Every structure is written in C-alpha cells, then in structure tokens.
C-alpha cells in the first residue's frame, strides 16, 4: 500500500440535517461504534455490523438517535471504557446530556443544566486519576465549559442518582472554547487544560480528588503586559497519549506544543504554522 492510498472504498453515513461538528469512536471493546454530533441538535450512534470488519462494506447501521437537545450539539466525548458505553454531549442549549447503554439493550439519559448561554466542550476524567486508594469505587467525573467563562466539574452521585456539580473554575474572562483532561499514564496528579476566547490557556492541577485545583497559565506572549495572551482565540487543546505534551490550536493558524519542565513551568517546545492556500 502506498502512502495516502485508501484502505477501502469508504462509506458516507447520511442522516444529519446540518453541519456535523464532531465524530468520536467508542472503545473497541464495545464493537465498531461511532458517534456523530451536529448543528441540527442531534447525536447519532452508528455501528458497523459487517461480518468481515470492513468499514466500507455497507454494514453500518444507526442504532441510536439522540434528539433531546434544542440547539446545536457542539461536542461529544466517550467516557473511559471502565465506566461502560457512556457518551457525554455538550449543546448550545446550555445542557449536557449523558447517554448510557444498559445491559438490557436500552439507553438511559441524564440531563444537566450546565452553562447558561451554551456549552462548548466536555471531557472525562481518566478513571485511574480519580481513585484514592486500592479497592475504592471508581469515580465518574467530567468537565464542561461554555459561554459563561466557567469550567465546571461534575461527578455522578450514587446517593442522588444523578450528576452533581462539585467545582467551578473561574479564571477565564470570556467564552471557554475547549477543555481536556490529560491521560493518566505515569502522572502523579490530575491535569486539565482549558482554552478560551480570552486568548489564554490555563493548566489546572489537582493532587487528589478532594484537593483544590491549582491554576498555571501558559506564557506565549513576548511583552510583559501580554505574557499570558496568545495572538488570537484559542480553539482547541489536546494532550499527547502520555499526557506530558499539550498541543494548542490558535486562531492565527499556529499550533504550538508545550511541556512542563522540572521546575513546574510550561515551555513551548515546538510551533507549527499552518500553510495558507
């Protein structure tokens, strides 16, 4: 196979009535399952049921239509597979819905009124970073971000049988565009990155699940009065698989990579300028 050559014919999954903002694969232990989120306010869950495993064989079926939102669904994220087949959906209607596939084949839905004015992003905390001691029950936590400039942390409460807000992170001054928990491989604490319309990226750390969050801004600016400011809106943040390098995507067409040094400071180790056609 030559570089860039298609593996198969491919297949177009049709059904949404507006732009599709995001797609997300479920963990392979649940099968070949793909979720899609759209401006039409719907989330579709698709499953490839072909016997030979080919993605382009016409074996895709839409197994769930999630249409409870009244505005665009902007982001989706599957929970850690240890928590089951669970999908969080963030919408411009201000709500976050959590879809869970049950053992009897049914789907259950939890709705959370998260952010007045709209929710832009959602991210699940890795399971291993939320366990305080061996044998302790797995904590089910996620972070959401939206138009209120606030990042909220939620936890599923067995006592109340619903998701409850346990923390608010309030350092941003404008819409929070993205939020991302770092993978927990080899990390001593929990890391959470947030990106905002205010042109800043903040790194939040928590030593244990009950400790307060500590905030450290990235420092991309050359001028002392603008040290925390990127050149434009920061749209996305994404962690490396090992969780020690953060990619930052900015509105000026640049992607920068950041890494924490031994002193606990974050340094830009690389920068890529996207070509303009």
Q: Where are these predicted regions, by residue range?
A:
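Terminal intrinsically disordered, low-complexity extensions flanking WD-repeat/beta-propeller proteins
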Residues: 130, 177, 183, 187-190, ...
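Solenoidal tandem-repeat scaffolds enriched in leucines and small polar residues
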Residues: 56-157
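WD40/WD-repeat beta-propeller blade-loop signature
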Residues: 9, 19, 30-33, 62, ...
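Loop/turn segments within WD40 beta-propeller blades
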Residues: 24-31, 77-84, 123-139, 180-189, ...
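WD40-repeat beta-propellers
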Residues: 1-2, 23, 43-48, 76, ...
